[in-house]
Amino acid sequence: MKQFTISPNESGQRFDKYLKKLLSNASGSFVYKMLRKKNITLNDHKADGTEKLNAGDLVKLFLSDETFEKFSGEDEANSEYMKLKSIDSGRLQVVYEDDDVIIMNKPSGMLSQKAVPEDISANEYILSYLIRKGSLSEDQFKTFKPSICNRLDRNTSGLLIAGKTLNGLQTMAEALKKRTVQKYYRCIVKGELRENTHLKGYLSKDEQKNKVKVVSRIRPEEKADYLPIETEYRPVAVSNGYTELEVHL
């Protein structure tokens, strides 16, 4: 029998999703069969998998060690965990952290998320940092992996927000979607701009050519092909034909 206590960073997710991550090599039908037969229980009661987990919930799996090892993908998860633990998280510049959220300053040249498996991105540095400080155990890593909520281009430096818990991840993702968290950028442009400006226009992207077209106005029949966009900027400093701008997208 295996027993697990739900941690704060695992809470909030559906029981069946938790189990499918815990038993990553098992089929969904196997997981639901074990629930029906009470070979898997939640707080010593029968469960159907739709329950929302809370911190402190007790999960019991009445499975043999061989069966658990077969379906848990433990070797693969442990290998990934140890690889992350070996990463030097010293490059991570933490500017804010609480129980649910961590905010880092991503330097230019660092990927937000990896493009190929061998990349080490900001996401890996965050996971390494949490593992090294003891905030993410091997068992927790199998069922929930903290992740960044926003992305920046490789050559752009700035703040990245990551959810340490499912609640933190969902809350910040929703805040970014609803724009209750505002995004501001700093850039240097050629030319001397001295007034705050609010621009409105329309954007169309050619996916095949990977080109973007921006126009100030469109005809009614073109509405389906364009997205409305708005940009605000204010001059921060002007010098020798260049302007530093604060841009709100």
Listing of model-derived features with the role each one plays in the protein:
Residues 1-249:
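RNA pseudouridine synthases
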